[in-house]
Amino acid sequence: MEIYLVTGNMNKKEEFLKMMDEELNVEFVNINLEEIQAQDIVEINEHKVKTAYNILKKQDNNKNKKRYVITDDTGLFISKLNNFPGPYIKWMQKALGSKGIADVVSRLDDNTCHAICTYSVYDGKDVHSFKGITNGKIVEPRGNNKFGWDNIFQPESLSKTFGEMTFDEKQNLSPRFKAFVQLKEFLMNEHKKYNNEF
């Protein structure tokens, strides 16, 4: 059983390794994937994971081996902008930066939002998707910006942005971690089933 996480982002890789059980060996592959244009973050990610799986399968001589391919996607959904930018956050971030996004939201009478992260895993037959959601608000940039908009996202009922938190502080709150817990449970169960077959 081989597990591949598709990412070229070193921060995501580092975070994934901190969260993953050492019992599972994960290979990281960097594949440039086209994303479909859609508002549904799960739909986008499921399309992405199938594309990645097919690319990896074509590159491998052993077509019959059991492989699990994982992709992730994240969105920031701003209430007063009818949940825009959602899955298009990386493009908004690239165009405006964190400060620009915070400036746009500061002109609204409501700065609430929610962040969603999805992991999708595909084994060539079935796609399984896992979603984590964290409610919060957009604030002026504070802290580091290691992950896109961390320095402007302040979780509900807290006074720190993700950018001001340590890894441990952020972990239980982040939508990525919430989705990851579900993904890990699924992979551990698949790993047990796979080992019982041999």
Swiss-Prot record:
Example GO BP: deoxyribonucleoside triphosphate catabolic process
Pfam families: Ham1p_like
Molecular function terms from GO: dITP diphosphatase activity; ITP diphosphatase activity; metal ion binding; nucleoside triphosphate diphosphatase activity; nucleotide binding; XTP diphosphatase activity
Catalytic activity: ITP + H2O = IMP + diphosphate + H(+); dITP + H2O = dIMP + diphosphate + H(+); XTP + H2O = XMP + diphosphate + H(+)
Keywords assigned by UniProt, alphabetized: Cytoplasm, Hydrolase, Magnesium, Manganese, Metal-binding, Nucleotide metabolism, Nucleotide-binding
Comment on bound cofactor: Binds 1 divalent metal cation per subunit; can use either Mg(2+) or Mn(2+).
Enzyme Commission number, as recorded: 3.6.1.66
Annotated positions binding Mg(2+): 35
Gene3D superfamilies in the cross-refs: 3.90.950.10
Subcellular location: Cytoplasm
CC annotations in GO: cytoplasm
Swiss-Prot/TrEMBL cofactor(s): Mg(2+); Mn(2+)
Protein residues bound to ITP: 7-12, 48, 73-74, 90, 147-150, 170, 175-176
Assigned protein family: Belongs to the HAM1 NTPase family.
Classification via PANTHER family: INOSINE TRIPHOSPHATE PYROPHOSPHATASE, INOSINE TRIPHOSPHATE PYROPHOSPHATASE/HAM1 PROTEIN
The protein's role, per its UniProt record: Pyrophosphatase that hydrolyzes non-canonical purine nucleotides such as inosine triphosphate (ITP), deoxyinosine triphosphate (dITP) or xanthosine 5'-triphosphate (XTP) to their respective monophosphate derivatives. The enzyme does not distinguish between the deoxy- and ribose forms. Probably excludes non-canonical purines from RNA and DNA precursor pools, thus preventing their incorporation into RNA and DNA and avoiding chromosomal lesions.
Assembly information from the UniProt record: Homodimer.
Protein known as: Inosine triphosphate pyrophosphatase
